[in-house]
């Protein structure tokens, strides 16, 4: 990283040399602290499961200390869902638990329940310039896709808020995709600049330099061949029943070629379905395509429906059972907030001390 006005310039660069991939050895897993999470904008779908949820559970089971954030404050950057925010938050926790996250081993909490985390945003904002924020490609992209006539301040400072998310618990690893590296670079820059400006009296740094844990999961497209999205109607929700799953997959786009092959560039719709079946079967997508062969779109969709419903049957059963006790979901959030608040309060106290605040 360059020292001056480049918090977002690294958006055009590859991952840092110290970053890790999901298959890299972690050494002592218990020595690592991971921050990850989601915005509660709606139900999680199969893309979330194969892209992030599976890996979170794997890290948890290895003994990594996990912090899983329900980013409810970040939802209001670009939408007003006040009438559904509590429901979406509970359903997100429901998906987490059904997928295998264990609240005894993972701290699951909501932004709005941890005041000290959000208070870190103020000193952190003093460490980045307006020009740096305006160059952040993720912010630019979200602004371009926003329906708002004017961008609000919360959206504009979104990367710094994410830096506070990461640094409040002093996370040293952050699972991200390549497209999220610019946000992580902001957190790295904030940490470095804060440590340079406000070191401890003995020279110790307050914050670690967080590293990326780059996902090796293939991008699972939606049923229309485009990006899988909760808002585009091209995704199967984790909690969907088997009939709904079948209906959505039967309506997926394919092409006129009867021979089923796996070619994501030339045949994105067909290849997306093949990949979904392969992920559920834990097989190579080329082998799945070869097995279907000349069966055509109907055989492909049957295979996908059977594969998805079989793979997710245990998860969906757990989800249905957990859904009968909404009070437990709220208790998970309260317990997580208690742990997160203790850590955030200690971090804020340390920040105020090195800054010389009374």
Spans of model-derived segments:
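A generic structural motif
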Residues: 40, 174-175, 234
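Structured ligand/cofactor/substrate-binding pocket environments in proteins
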Residues: 44-51, 59, 65-71, 81-88, ...
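A generic secondary-structure signal for well-formed alpha-helical elements
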Residues: 93, 100, 128-132, 171, ...
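N-terminal Rossmann-like or analogous alpha/beta NTP/dinucleotide-binding catalytic cores
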Residues: 2-164, 320
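Short amphipathic alpha-helical segments, especially helix-boundary/capping motifs
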Residues: 29-33, 49, 66-72, 97-99, ...
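Generic detector of short, locally flexible boundary/turn motifs and exposed helical patches
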Residues: 31-35, 73, 133-135, 181-184, ...
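Short helix-capping/linker segments at secondary-structure and domain boundaries
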Residues: 64, 130-134, 168-175, 278-288, ...
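Conserved nucleotide- and phosphate/pyrophosphate-binding catalytic cores
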Residues: 6-10, 188-358
């Amino acid at each position: 990283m360059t020292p001056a006005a480049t918090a977002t310039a690294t958006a055009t660069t590859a991952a840092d040399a110290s970053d890790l991939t999901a298959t890299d050895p972690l050494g002592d897993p218990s020595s690592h602290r991971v921050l990850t999470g989601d915005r509660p904008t709606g139900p999680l779908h199969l893309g979330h499961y194969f892209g992030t949820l599976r890996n979170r559970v794997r890290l948890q089971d290895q003994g990594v200390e996990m912090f899983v954030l329900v980013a409810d404050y970040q939802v209001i950057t670009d939408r007003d869902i006040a009438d559904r925010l509590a429901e979406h938050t509970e359903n997100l926790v429901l998906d987490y638990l059904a997928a295998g996250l264990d609240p005894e081993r993972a701290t699951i909490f909501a932004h709005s329940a941890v005041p000290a985390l959000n208070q870190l945003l103020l000193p952190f904002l003093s460490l980045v310039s307006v020009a740096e924020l305006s160059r952040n490609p993720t912010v630019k992209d979200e602004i371009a896709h926003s329906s708002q006539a004017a961008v609000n301040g919360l959206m504009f400072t979104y990367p710094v808020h994410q830096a506070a998310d990461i640094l409040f618990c002093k996370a040293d690893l952050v699972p991200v995709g390549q497209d999220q590296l610019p946000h992580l670079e902001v957190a790295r820059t904030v940490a470095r600049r804060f440590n340079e400006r406000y070191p401890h009296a003995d020279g110790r740094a307050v914050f670690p330099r967080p590293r990326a844990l780059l996902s090796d999961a293939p991008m699972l497209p939606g049923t229309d061949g485009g990006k899988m999205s909760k808002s585009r109607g091209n995704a199967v929700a984790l909690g969907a029943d088997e009939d709904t799953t079948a209906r959505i997959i039967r309506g997926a786009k394919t092409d006129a070629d009867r021979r089923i092959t796996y070619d994501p560039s030339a045949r994105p719709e067909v290849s997306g379905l093949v990949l979904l079946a392969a992920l559920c079967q834990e097989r190579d997508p080329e082998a799945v395509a070869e097995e279907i062969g000349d069966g055509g779109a109907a055989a492909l969709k049957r295979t996908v429906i059977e594969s998805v419903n079989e793979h997710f049957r245990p998860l969906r059963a757990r989800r249905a059972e957990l859904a009968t006790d909404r009070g437990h979901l709220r208790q998970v959030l309260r317990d997580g907030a208690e742990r997160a608040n203790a850590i955030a309060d200690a971090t804020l106290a340390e920040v105020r001390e090195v800054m010389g605040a009374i």
